[in-house]
Regions:
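Helical subdomain adjoining the active site within ATP-dependent kinase catalytic cores
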Residues: 280-283, 294-344
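Active-site activation/catalytic loop segments of kinase-like enzymes and analogous catalytic loops
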Residues: 233-276, 290-308
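Catalytic-loop of the protein kinase fold
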Residues: 199-201, 206
Length: 344
């Protein structure tokens, strides 16, 4: 996706009023898959690369593509020296170019899309996963009252979020899956209605992080889904990777040892040390079921849009094909003893 030249000129003018000066001779380069919030590489007059992130063009669903939300989160995290890009300027007046946008620092490093890290040696694989766990624990350890974010501090995020996803996909009786429905109704009664709140990333995974040359997590990207909620949301989304077979989405499965990766138990221990709290295994088991149902609903949503002929990501077919495997993992995990959920 290209950035319209007239829009770019308006952006340059706006940023100059914010004391941010763009190199007009460097054409914006589209980066990322462009399916969510269009993202461009730009350069300032001191020859430093920066990132411009905008809302998509056209009508947007209420509450979707909140780049202003991302900006405020990055601003709060920058004050904590957290591993995330520093934001510089936000334009929340959509009348300027028809949509909101902001600029943040460009973080150089590697983005890994294969969770098995085939190009890394054993030591580096451990460093990368340990760093991911520590950074996630650090995020969840922050006092949300000190972050000054305009987010609601309501308890019961997991119940609300799961109900939202489930109802969105299975509102039509003819499309309901009896096996999924049984698990959904059961787990909904097990999810917490209250408890501690943390700042959640909402989509914390390997390919949403930038890894430095010393194999540390240098920056966490894509904060569009961030909110206040139970930290179990983010940590369970990581732990299920050891339950999902390798080759299916972000799965590590039973190949973790063969590929020299740390275990889920290792990851959880590193996370707990950084978070400075122990995670209850029964609660984590329930959270893993939550994450698997939610992931299944996301995949079914992609399938629905695909069959309706609506625009979806380039890897839509791959994600659609993954749905049966995720359902199988979900059903097996639901019947598994909580202590066996944590692969070690």
């Amino acid at each position: 996706m290209d950035l319209d030249q007239s829009d770019f000129e308006k952006i340059i003018e706006f940023l100059s009023l914010e004391n941010f000066f763009v190199d007009k001779n460097f054409n914006p380069k589209s980066i990322g898959d462009g399916q969510s919030n269009p993202t461009f590489l730009i350069r300032d007059t001191e020859n430093n690369f920066k990132v411009l992130r905008t809302q998509p063009i056209g009508d947007l669903a209420r509450g979707a593509h909140r780049v202003d939300r991302e900006y405020f989160v990055l601003k709060a995290l920058s004050s904590k020296s957290f591993e995330a890009p520093e934001p510089f300027a936000l334009c929340d007046n959509s009348e300027l170019i028809g949509r909101m946008f902001y600029v943040m620092n460009f973080e150089e490093g590697d983005i890994n899309f294969d969770p098995l890290l085939p190009n890394e040696n054993l030591e580096n694989k451990k460093k990368i996963y340990k760093s991911l766990a520590e950074v996630l624990g650090k995020l969840h350890s922050y006092d949300i009252n000190e972050l000054n974010l305009p987010f609601k501090k309501n308890h019961g995020f997991m119940k609300r979020n799961l109900s939202l996803w489930y109802d969105q996909i299975f509102h039509d009786e003819s499309k309901k899956d009896k096996e999924i429905e049984k698990i959904y109704k059961n787990i909904l009664t097990e999810l917490p209605s209250d408890g501690g709140l943390s700042l959640l990333h909402g989509d914390f995974k390997l390919d949403n992080t930038v890894i430095s040359d010393d194999k540390k997590c240098k920056a966490v990207l894509d904060w569009e889904l961030s909110s206040f909620g139970e930290p179990l949301v983010d940590i369970s989304f990581q732990i299920i990777n050891w339950l999902i077979p390798s080759g299916v989405l972000y799965g590590i499965g039973g190949d973790w040892k063969e590929n020299g990766l740390p275990s889920a138990s290792d990851f959880l221990l590193w996370y707990e040390k950084s978070y400075k709290e122990e995670v209850d295994i029964q609660s984590l088991r329930n959270a893993c079921i939550f994450s698997l149902i939610k992931l299944f609903c996301i995949l079914k949503g992609i399938e629905n849009r695909f069959h309706q002929g609506n625009a979806v990501s380039k890897d839509a077919e791959e994600k659609i094909l993954a749905a049966p495997a995720i359902k199988e993992v979900l059903m097996n995990s639901f019947e598994t003893n909580p202590n066996d959920i944590i692969v070690s």
